[in-house]
Amino acid sequence: MRKIFYDFEVFKHLWLVVFIDYDTGKGKCIVNNEDQLRDFYNKTKNDIYIGYNSRGYDQYIFKGILLGMDPYYISSQIIEKNKKGYEVVKKGWKIPFNNFDISTGFHSLKQLEGFMGSRIKESSVPFDLDRELTESEIKETVSYCLHDVKETIKVFDGKREEFDSQLALIEAFKLDMNKFTKTKAQLSAFTLGAEKQPNRNDEFDLRFPDTLVVSEKYQHIVDWYKDPENLDYKKKLKVDVAGVPHIFAWGGIHGALPKIKDEGIILCADVASLYPSLMIEYGYNSRNIKDPKRYTEIRDKRLKLKAEKNPMQLPLKIVLNC
């Protein structure tokens, strides 16, 4: 199964795509030719396409062209109207497509190029041109697109474990390869048999564990969570615990010394599957999971594999932590 990196550039009167085979380094450029794109797809549809922001954009341009849609319409709906790709290319599900998105979700490709010390290449050809592109403009756009694909490969090389863990997750649970385009959270939900439910509007109906023991010194932290005034995701509590600055909020707890220099025996204490175990012990698992025992079984199997130093524990860890 080959890894094919790709990127689309779309104008009103022209579209183009650049593909690069990861293992051979061979590239292919297709400009405004639906037949060539269809032929390439038929030869590579069992391989994995990898792009930057391809989950939300490029794969739908690809699918839309194969379905006879106008790529510029698709692009403008996604970018300008802020629509989801599946809302625009409604029959996209009919096109089998093994897509993997290497984007971070926090940075643009250009930002990462800068972080990696690469030359940031910009195109002087505006994407809102309302005319045919000249030969020189097409040549520049191809060069720009090729550069972006090569930079995407660099990002991939730096985040290879993301791809490997995704593949391991699919193989461990014998999922179809067309699930590759899903996020790890989506794959985990599928693996656990979770189903989307209507909004219950009860996320602040807090239930504290009956085993919770807090000294008087830190009782104010528990009281902070009980205070109706603090039932706001923007609120947070900053307080020292055991001499260490902590931040308590609704996404969790973070505590660390700003900086420290020490010598001697330094211990690093860790608990295997701490949060999954707490979820199991106190019934804090997602109510969308039909059979909570499934989660417990995966936790137990993961701990067994980890003790055996079996690498197959990694995809199970992903499911537990998502």
Q: Positions of the model-derived regions?
A:
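Gly/Thr-rich phosphate-binding beta-strand-loop-beta motif of the actin/hexokinase/Hsp70
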Residues: M1-Y22, I266, S273-L278
